Amino acid sequence: MTTESGSDSESKPDQEAEPQEAAGPQGQAGAQPGPEPAGGNGSLNGEKQQPALEQFPEAAAHSTPVKREIGDKDRDFAAAAAKQLEYQQFEDDKLSQRSSSSKLSRSPLKIVKRPKSMQCKVTLLDGSEYGCDVDKRSRGQVLFDKVCEHLNLLEKDYFGLTYRDAENQKNWLDPAKEIKKQIRSGAWHFSFNVKFYPPDPAQLSEDITRYYLCLQLRDDIVSGRLPCSFVTLALLGSYTVQSELGDYDPDECGNDYISEFRFAPNHTKELEDKVIELHKSHRGMTPAEAEMHFLENAKKLSMYGVDLHHAKDSEGVEIMLGVCASGLLIYRDRLRINRFAWPKVLKISYKRNNFYIKIRPGEFEQFESTIGFKLPNHRAAKRLWKVCVEHHTFFRLLLPEAPPKKFLTLGSKFRYSGRTQAQTRRASALIDRPAPYFERSSSKRYTMSRSLDGASVSENHEIYMKDSVSAAEVGTGQYATTKGISQTNLITTVTPEKKAEEERVEEEDRRKKAEEATPVTALRHEGKTDSERTDTAADGETSATESDQEEDAEIKAQDLDKTQDELMKHQTNISELKRTFLETSTETALTNEWEKRLSTSPVRLAARQEDAPMIEPLVPEETKQSSGEKLMDGSEILSLLESARKPTEFIGGVSSTTQSWVQKLETKTEPVEAEVESTPHPQPLSTEKVLQETILVEERHVMSVHASGDASHTARDEVDAAESTPTDRRHTGKGKEGSSVTEAAKEQRGEEVDQSAPEQEQPATVSHEEEQASTIRTSEGLEQKSHFESSTVRVESTSVGSISPGGAKLEISTKEVPVVHTETKTITYESSQVDPGADLEPGVLMSAQTITSETTSTTTTTHITKTVKGGISETRIEKRIVITGDADIDHDQALAQAIKEAKEQHPDMSVTKVVVHKETEITPEDGED
């Protein structure tokens, strides 16, 4: 069977004339087989057409009439022409039936189906719903563009659409993939959410973008995903009210004008009162300004922009993996135990339900280390991997990485298909339109509080971590070797995407390199356990594509991005507001209630390391110490501690769970007042070494009154399991607010200071020196409700000291100071609430760990112990920070600053004890101090 091509059939009408005229009396015979082509293959063509006529009898009967004998020549010619036209119609029908693969030609009566459209419902950030119809075969980008057009949103790269799968897990809608392939069953219901939280919301171009970011953060706070203190809740709530309602008007605003708003998971009348009080102080602030202040405070929260995923480590311990702009965060028992900045991550991959992180080797390492985690199932592993790929691409790369184009590839082809943050910022700078008008909706939608997993409000303290039986073993497994990351490798949330920013960071790093070494040095010494040497074969994997030079510069300058000007600006902005906020709570009952709310507010996971040296945006008790203020005697120290000694009362349903935060305790030390001069000979009043120790011991809630003895024991017994001279602090004037000088205290205290900095004080102790050691102890909840049977204690102690040697750090030789005269004085201030019998019952030591990190100017030693006594689980984190300086340091100022820092970093605790130990060693050369 032969099928003629379309080009041959189309050329036949042009060739019909010549054969038809040349046929003459044989026109009928020539007409029947059809026209001959110019090549003279008429007979062959006729033979081919005859079987075709036999195979289609209906078409042949229709197109070929019965032959009739007509004598007239003209009628024969006309009949032949008519038959030729009918035959051409037959040829067209035959070609359409034989050559076409379309089913429509075979079934001309069948109705063509139009593409099916699907009804979509999108829940917006203000609680309203937006409905639209999209083609069933549309990609996710089509629906997302419709939603953004409805919202009049141009800076849309920070946002995305989410949907719930069959397991009720949140998934991000892939804009490059068809919607029907992502939602296999069920209705097409989506939620519009912020996908990438901008590290600096001030860089957003339009107010409408910041407004939707505020809506997302308010929902995060109400749902418990973004925990913050009671003070922060009140301040953010006041900005929310100012943004939506404007200035406070006593004529229009009644006592309950904000009762319809929802500010916190545990919304209370006390919170409303504080919000109203702060709202009155915002008079004249525009809605856009209020939202900017809201974002400036919210971005400093520890959980800002962190996407949490449940997982288990190699030992089967429940952890949480958080993905944010700066990298990967690892939480265990609400403690951030590790962080992997994007420059340190070499590759992320998954295989089945395992998720792997390959870490770039350090300066003194030869091989990469791979850490594996186990997720609930393979879908959760892939979901986490995709989130990591998108965050890394958006925040770190200048251009998105193209998916692999090979036909056969191993692993997933998924890559982030949107614009990066660098591209978004460039596009935002080109926006040229009037500021869009939009209505700021009310907060009536916040009627029910929910936690991350749908738990009730009383379980909000447990939403991030599940309490584990092995929670006491803080220093086990791979985290014992990698825990130094969280104390030294500080990461700023603003990651540079442009070469200019990178060059600026490198220049700043070179300028400050002489003052402090790279904080990542502790990373270099971390060992690799067997659990880290995991197979990296994965179903999906991606690699960081930055150059090594960029990564090294990024790591070295992580904690140098924030300048002193930014710190002072932040302190001025926040502290002034908090002072007016706190000055209103003058009554004792109100203060106790205030501290009670602080203790029961959602726990901050950490003082944001990425914003170091920024302090927590809100502190309940601000210690006003100017830069030149001094503590000349004990009365001023007592005044600092007076407001923090009130007992707190815990109300809630939280079981005993460790709530110590290593990274919060290890945020920063005082800036070095002066560099150490490398002078081998002592100069009077020219060289001085300052030892500032910050011992932070903290636990969270206390049980009942009968357990206050254990709590008081914790408050009194400062000495950790790693310390060798515990008797000094126990016997220096306990219960007295005066001074007691004992020779044993002098000698033991001197030895203790020496042990706190083993690599620095050997030459310093022999030389002439002045020691000032102070211990600030803060304890929370020494008086509790008797109906609690089990809880934990949070205790904080800070120690500040100074050593003034007659030479440089380690260059001093002992032959320069043959004789040392020592004068010692010890002053102890202690709260009368401490139980005198607290230290009689020993605790059972569950775990102990010591972490030491050192730079050119700072040595940090952290002792972490966990004990259980009397049904109370107590975690003690004692930190000593030794700062070396070369100037005439004001020791009283250093003490005041340490107290201030301790209260700023831990606002939910009260100071109960201060020990000032001053030891002056006089050499014959220097004379008496």
Swiss-Prot record:
Chief location: cytoplasm
Region: Disordered, residue numbers: 1-72, 490-554, 608-630, 665-689, 705-807
Region annotation Spectrin--actin-binding: where it falls in the sequence: 559-602
PTM annotation (Phosphothreonine): residues: T495, T518, T545, T725, T923
Chain positions with N-acetylthreonine modification: T2
Gene Ontology BP terms: apoptotic process; axon development; cortical actin cytoskeleton organization; cortical cytoskeleton organization; myelin maintenance; neuron projection morphogenesis; paranodal junction assembly; paranodal junction maintenance
N-terminal signal peptide: none
Protein name stated in the entry: Band 4.1-like protein 3
Species for this entry: Mus musculus
InterPro entries cross-referenced by the UniProt entry: Band4.1-L3_FERM_F1, Band_4.1_C, Band_41_domain, Ez/rad/moesin-like, FA, FERM/acyl-CoA-bd_prot_sf, FERM_2, FERM_central
Known role: Tumor suppressor that inhibits cell proliferation and promotes apoptosis. Modulates the activity of protein arginine N-methyltransferases, including PRMT3 and PRMT5.
Membrane topology: Peripheral membrane protein
Bias (Low complexity) ranges: 20-33, 789-802
PROSITE patterns, sorted: FERM_1, FERM_2, FERM_3
Disulfide bonds: none
Biased composition (Basic and acidic residues): 496-516, 523-536, 726-737
Phosphoserine, modified sites: S96, S428, S451, S486, S543, S547, S802, S804
Location in or out of the cell: Cytoplasm, Cytoskeleton; Cell membrane; Cytoplasm; Cell junction
